[in-house]
């Protein structure tokens, strides 16, 4: 009976889990409590462990959040999907070796393939930029839950993605920007049933605290392997 009750409680918990809650859960698995900046490959190999599967699971959650923003984020969403698939394919080729993202970046740097259009290094870079956008948007939301969503999304895009996007992608984003939902609609679809805006705000704050050190570490690794400034091919 006790086991059955525990199973029912777990099922209920899963049903109540929001995208924000799922994101917190995935980032908690990564266990990056503080920022570690590396400057040499030896440090990257010996100190940094970036488990690939939880990282990709988190990126899949970003896709779900972007879906709630609507067609405006279609270009970014498509890019994220493709980049996740590229890294998953590499992982599937040797799950033991490529369970750590650093090993993938190291392999391509050694082969001289990091800068190729379909490299896994580029995939990791663009996923990092998608996370940069997500962090910027969450920080704006937690600061002011009543702000204009269209303006917030445009400013976050201009800051994190636009400098690296080609003009076609930037133009497509600009056209779709008018389809952004208002802030109340967006917050409500992020919330669980009976969850207040304050509760959502608290969850977002928790997520931000996990995302900041992860992104600092990712940028450090990307800079080390000299792929951090690559633009769209």
UniProtKB/Swiss-Prot annotation:
High-level lineage: Eukaryota, Viridiplantae, Streptophyta, Embryophyta, Tracheophyta
GO cellular component, one term: cytoplasm
Family annotation (InterPro entries): GLTP_sf (IPR036497), Glycolipid_transfer_prot_dom (IPR014830)
Alphabetized UniProt keyword annotations: Lipid transport, Transport
GO molecular function: lipid transfer activity
Pfam families on file: GLTP
Family listed: Belongs to the GLTP family.
UniProt name for this protein: Glycolipid transfer protein 3
Function noted in UniProt: May be involved in glycolipids transfer.
Residues that hold a ganglioside GM3 (d18:1(4E)) according to the record: 79, 83, 126, 165
Signal peptide: none
Top-level taxonomic group: Eukaryota
């Amino acid at each position: 009976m006790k086991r059955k009750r525990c199973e029912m409680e777990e099922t209920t918990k899963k049903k109540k889990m929001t995208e924000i809650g799922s994101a917190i859960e995935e980032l908690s698995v990564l266990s990056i409590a503080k920022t570690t900046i590396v400057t040499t490959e030896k440090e990257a190999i010996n100190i940094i462990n970036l488990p690939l599967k939880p990282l990709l699971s988190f990126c899949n959650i970003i896709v779900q959040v972007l879906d709630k923003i609507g067609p405006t984020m279609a270009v970014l969403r498509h890019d994220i999907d493709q980049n996740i698939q590229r890294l998953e394919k590499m992982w599937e080729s040797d799950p033991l070796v490529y369970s750590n993202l650093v090993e993938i970046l190291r392999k391509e740097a050694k082969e001289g393939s990091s800068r190729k259009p379909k490299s896994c290094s580029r995939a990791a870079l663009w996923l990092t930029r998608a996370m940069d956008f997500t962090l910027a948007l969450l920080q704006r939301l937690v600061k002011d839950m009543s702000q204009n969503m269209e303006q917030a999304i445009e400013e976050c895009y201009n800051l994190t993605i636009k400098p690296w996007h080609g003009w076609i992608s930037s133009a497509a984003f600009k056209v779709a920007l008018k389809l952004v939902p208002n802030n109340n609609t967006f917050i409500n679809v992020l919330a669980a049933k009976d969850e207040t805006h304050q509760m959502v705000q608290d969850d977002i704050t928790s997520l931000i605290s996990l995302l900041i050190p992860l992104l600092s570490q990712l940028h450090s690794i990307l800079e080390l392997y000299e792929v951090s400034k690559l633009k769209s091919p």
